[in-house]
């Protein structure tokens, strides 16, 4: 037998309590689907996808790789490693990017958020977080040694959840009322930072309007220590809107139905 570590999101036990069937994604355990009664996997993921399309759904995205890219030359660095340009990305905006290996094959894809002039928040796919970090460190240490850029793996520091569906904005307007959720104020690929108030606790969060399924959707990240609390808080709102939690099978299904790129 070969020993291998297992990584779990901050909301792992809540997924089990909700009846999730878990699956492996890289080193992580992620919810595969949430069956009701005697549902098969096909029954469950089709229901989850349909509910998300009709009302609202929430999925755990904590396992995505997360890398802080900081420094005076961070923009130049990102503009070199992605095949699409990042030089004109303004503060408060996110952009989807594709990264290639030295042989021209795709290494990874994901979104990068510009939080400040010299501060970016990069997300990677779950399985490629390590290889992407290694690739970028190699570039800085052996090829572009003149660039003033600092990389930090912050995957374990942030709990992430995506809220998708036609009622996603309505839900978040109630859950995080400090923000203006209108299309004018919160356009596609916009990035905001706010505070979630749960009882006497104030929790800082970063939110981007990003869709992986073709529906209106938002990604929300909070400190990992508050992940379980925020997940339960938002799950209660999901239930009020007749929505559901959904797993990776529904993610893949809705992603393909939306004709989105899959790496």
Where are these regions (language model features)?
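Residues forming anionic-ligand binding surfaces in small-molecule and nucleic-acid pockets
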Residues: 50-62, 108-118, 152-153, 203-216
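Well-ordered mid-protein domain cores that form the structural environment of catalytic cofactors
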Residues: 88-118, 122-138
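Internal alpha/beta scaffold segment
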Residues: 126-153, 217-218, 222-250
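Conserved small/polar residues in nucleotide/adenosyl-binding loops
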Residues: 254-261
């Amino acid at each position: 037998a070969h020993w291998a570590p297992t990584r779990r999101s901050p909301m792992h036990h809540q997924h089990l309590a909700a009846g999730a069937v878990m699956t492996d994604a890289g080193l992580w355990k992620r919810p595969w689907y949430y069956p009701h009664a005697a549902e098969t996997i096909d029954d469950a993921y089709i229901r989850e996808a349909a509910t998300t399309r009709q009302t609202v759904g929430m999925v755990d995205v904590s396992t995505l790789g997360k890398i802080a890219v900081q420094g005076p030359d961070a923009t130049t660095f990102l503009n070199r490693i992605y095949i699409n340009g990042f030089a004109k990305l303004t503060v408060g905006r996110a952009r989807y990017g594709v990264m290639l290996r030295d042989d021209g094959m795709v290494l990874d894809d994901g979104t990068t958020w510009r939080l400040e002039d010299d501060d970016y928040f990069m997300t990677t796919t779950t399985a490629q977080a390590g290889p992407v970090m290694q690739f970028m460190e190699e570039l800085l240490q052996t090829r572009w040694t003149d660039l003033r850029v600092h990389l930090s793996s912050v995957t374990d520091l942030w709990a992430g959840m995506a809220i998708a569906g036609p009622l996603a904005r309505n839900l978040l307007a109630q859950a995080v009322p400090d923000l203006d959720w209108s299309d004018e104020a919160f356009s596609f690929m916009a990035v905001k930072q706010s505070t979630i108030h749960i009882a006497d606790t104030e929790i800082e969060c970063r939110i981007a309007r990003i869709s992986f399924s073709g529906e209106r959707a938002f990604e929300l990240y909070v400190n990992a220590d508050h992940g379980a609390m925020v997940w339960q808080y938002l799950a209660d709102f999901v239930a009020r809107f007749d929505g559901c939690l959904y797993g990776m099978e529904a993610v893949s299904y809705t992603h393909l139905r939306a004709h989105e790129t899959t790496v």
